[in-house]
A protein has these predicted regions:
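Low-complexity, Ser/Thr/Pro/Gly-enriched N-terminal "stalk/linker" regions
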Residues: 31-96, 113-118, 127-140, 460
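Secondary-structure edge/capping motif, primarily at the C-terminal ends of alpha-helices
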Residues: 188-192, 265-272
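Short amphipathic coiled-coil heptad-repeat segments
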Residues: 290-295
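Active-site core of glycosidic bond-cleaving carbohydrate-active enzymes
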Residues: 48, 93-126, 202-212, 251-270, ...
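Carbohydrate-binding/catalytic loop surfaces
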Residues: 72-92, 133-173, 225-250, 298-319, ...
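Bacterial Sec-dependent N-terminal signal peptides
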Residues: 1-33
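Aromatic-rich carbohydrate-recognition surfaces in CAZymes
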Residues: 91-226, 254, 385-388, 407, ...
């Protein structure tokens, strides 16, 4: 066969140029336009979110000796801390935000070890009363820990060890941190298989014992282990609504307790302690059975509580579906209702989620019944990215295409307002509102929580 260079060149042009043109078109439109039917996000959008999350977590690191705010001193804890976000916001180590971000996969083994043992070392070693009259029970876990002197602050609203515990933030520490402490240990074991850390003594008490003590700190109903509170002994139900007053039986911390019970059961299985493993399985089962009976309304929404603030709660509802607490019938009912609320514009804005549907506001002046924040700001009606993945998971149970749409709106807003574009940009924000209200740029759980949840969404 005669070799003809011109013929070969022309053939290559006919083959390569159309492919090149198609590639340019695809790149011009962006990978994010093309989402596989069975994936919640396109490959391009998922990679964007992973990279952004890794960048945000890196910007949230406080290295030994580093200072991020003049009044807070240097990091003298002996290891890296991860605060709730980048730039100057929240200059301390918050247990909650850190624990909720672990499943992003971007926290190293040594970083985990340091923050787990630091949290354990600041667990309350006695019951005491603050100068403001709040009670810190034996075994309580800090809300946040100072970086300069390592002192635990058990209550929101302050960085002062001496001034903590004012009435507006409860008379006992928030309930969620105890269960998230369990999650920190569980995730460390899950990712390192280093079981010996559970036997390590911290100030004379093993880590495993500390986990059990913490688990039993929040007050609970005797019959079913549901977390409960009263006006007199009120604790914050969960730190992402710490400017609200919510009383009675509490849904969100009970969901966290359910998850922590399963995690303790699995840890005891690994330690060959079947009796304890069975005990915590039983506790989880009782909580799972009680939650819909106590909190579910006729539409399938879970209310935040049975006392003050007993309003349908999007975050509790979505997280309960995410943790497989509801039955199949309940799940489908709730999923359809959330889908309808999303389509009607009552649930989200630019892919971010309200605590309460706009149709469920307490009245014209406030979203929550009792709030320290003005309506449509912060936790009282602004929109948050933290629960977006859980809500997508819930909606996907009955309408996968709609879940994809919500996820796409979330990614599109992150792309549009990506802080890497310049100092006037700040996404991921902690929360925002159509009025123009924004709060705390470069916020970690806004990307870390959805990233983890998106990885668990499969098309039914």
């Amino acid at each position: 066969m005669e070799f003809n260079l011109n013929t070969l060149t022309n053939h290559m042009k006919r083959t390569v140029f159309p492919l090149l043109f198609l590639t340019i078109i695809l790149l011009g439109h962006g990978q994010s336009m093309f989402t596989p039917k069975d994936a919640i996000l396109s490959d391009g959008d998922l990679e964007f979110l992973k990279t952004l999350t890794e960048t945000i977590i890196d910007s949230s690191r406080i290295y030994p000796g580093e200072r991020v705010a003049d009044q807070m001193g240097n990091n003298n804890t002996g290891g890296i801390l991860v605060k709730p976000g980048g730039r100057g916001s929240y200059p301390a180590f918050w247990i909650r935000d850190y624990a909720m971000s672990l499943e992003s996969g971007f926290i190293s083994r040594e970083e985990q070890r340091h923050m787990l043992l630091l949290t354990a070392s600041t667990q309350a070693d006695r019951t005491w009363i603050t100068k403001n009259g709040a009670l810190i029970p034996f075994g309580a876990i800090a809300d946040h820990i100072r970086m300069d002197d390592g002192l635990p602050i058990y209550f929101p609203g302050t960085y002062s060890f001496e001034e903590q515990g004012t009435p507006e933030f409860g008379r006992t520490p928030p309930y969620g941190d105890q269960f998230l402490f369990v999650h920190m240990a569980f995730y460390f074991i899950k990712t390192t298989s280093e079981l010996t850390i559970l036997e390590q003594k911290i100030n004379g008490t093993s880590l495993m014992d500390r986990l059990e003590i913490a688990f039993n700190v929040p007050p609970s109903r005797l019959e079913d282990h549901i977390v409960t509170t009263t006006d007199h002994f009120r604790g914050i139900d969960f730190g992402f609504r710490d400017v609200m007053t919510i009383t009675g039986d509490l849904c969100y911390p009970s969901i966290l307790k359910f998850k922590a019970a399963l995690e303790l059961s699995e840890l005891f299985e690994k330690l060959n302690n079947q009796q304890k493993a069975d005990k915590y399985q039983l506790i989880a089962g009782k909580i799972k059975e009680a939650i819909p009976l106590l909190f579910m309304d006729e539409r399938g929404m879970l209310k935040a509580s049975t006392g003050k603030g007993n309003q349908p709660d999007v975050w509790s509802t979505a997280l309960a579906l995410y943790y497989d607490i509801l039955s199949q019938v309940e799940t489908e009912k709730t999923s359809r209702f959330l889908s309808q609320a999303y389509e009607n514009g009552h649930l989200s804005y630019k892919g971010n989620i309200r605590h309460i549907l706009t149709t469920d506001d307490f009245d014209e002046s406030t979203a929550w019944e009792f709030s320290l924040a003005q309506k449509n700001t912060y936790q009282n009606g602004a929109y948050w990215g933290t629960p977006t993945g859980w809500v997508c998971y819930a909606i996907a149970k009955t309408n996968f295409k709609l879940a994809q749409q919500l996820a796409k709106e979330y990614i599109d807003d992150l792309r549009q307002n990506d802080f890497r574009k310049g100092p006037e940009y700040g996404a991921p924000y902690e929360c925002f509102h159509p009025s123009g209200h924004t709060q705390n740029p470069l916020y970690m759980t806004t990307v870390s929580c959805p990233l983890a949840a998106f990885g668990n969404i499969v098309k039914p």
